[in-house]
Design a protein with these regions (language model features):
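Catalytic alpha-helical scaffold of carbohydrate-active enzymes acting on polysaccharides/glycoconjugates
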Residues: 1-111, 117-173, 179, 187-204, ...
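Polyanion-engaging groove/track-forming segments
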Residues: 207-220, 224
């Protein structure tokens, strides 16, 4: 393992993404007095890297969690696909991850996110048996068919577990298309995105936006306007009562 490379990459991404975006989210949470909330799924491996090379990132996440407006999700410690190979190993990794979250942040995850949103109904039943109240999954067209990802579902064979699906179109508009000058909708503004989100949610329960955190500052550099976009987005989204 190349410790120097690990350290260099972590410091670069912390400087470009984690620290400035966490600071922005903290500012927005305080500004909107509890109306703006976010969730994070942080693997144990990432937490290990933060502690080793950029402990200030851990502290910035602690400040966010302390607001009561940030939820930390459960996942496998090593961001692995253990469930597909060994249910026992899967349970051990998830328990280890939750213990780490509790030790660092003083909260117990209640919602599960499998690596890369990989999902099947067997996973859902296992997650329900482990005591979680919801599981996240990809809102894949070939699975949904005519259905919309903008509703809360209950997985087959589960009694209580809620299934929350990613709206990949709206998520990818930010994560992948935001700075693409060839995209017909470029530039993406907060007002434009808000219109799309409200239109998509006209007959739905919710809209789940899931994306890599490195979207902000690393994949989409600060010079693209991604931070300014995110700073403006809550205000225009929250203009609609009840949203």
């Amino acid at each position: 393992e190349d410790e120097d490379a690990n350290c260099g990459i972590m410091l670069k991404v912390a400087r470009k993404c984690y620290l400035p975006m966490n600071a922005l989210l903290l500012k927005l949470i305080r500004k909107y007095d509890g109306r703006f909330k976010v969730s994070f799924s942080i693997s144990g491996t990432a937490l290990d890297q933060f502690e080793a090379y950029a402990p200030e990132v851990i502290q910035s996440f602690r400040e966010l969690v302390a607001t009561g407006c940030v939820e930390l999700l459960s996942e496998t410690y090593n961001h692995s696909l253990a469930f597909l190979y060994s249910p026992e190993e899967f349970r051990e990794q998830v328990a280890l991850h939750d213990e780490r979250i509790e030790a660092l942040f003083g909260v117990t995850p209640r919602v599960f996110r499998n690596t890369e949103l990989i999902y099947n109904n067997d996973l859902a039943r296992a997650v329900e048996a482990m005591g979680y109240k919801a599981v996240l999954a990809e809102g894949a067209d070939h699975v949904l068919g005519w259905r919309s990802p903008n509703f809360v579902y209950r997985p087959a064979g589960c009694d209580r577990l809620k299934l929350l699906l990613k709206n990949y179109r709206l998520s990818d508009d930010i994560a992948f298309r935001f700075s693409n000058h060839q995209w017909p909708e470029f530039p993406l503004t907060a007002d434009k995105f808000s219109e799309w989100a409200h239109a998509a949610n006209a007959s739905g329960d919710l809209i789940n936006l899931f994306m890599d955190y490195e979207t902000f500052g690393e994949h989409q550099w600060e010079s693209t306007g991604i931070f300014a976009f995110m700073e403006a987005l809550p205000e225009v989204m929250l203009r609609t009562p009840g949203f």
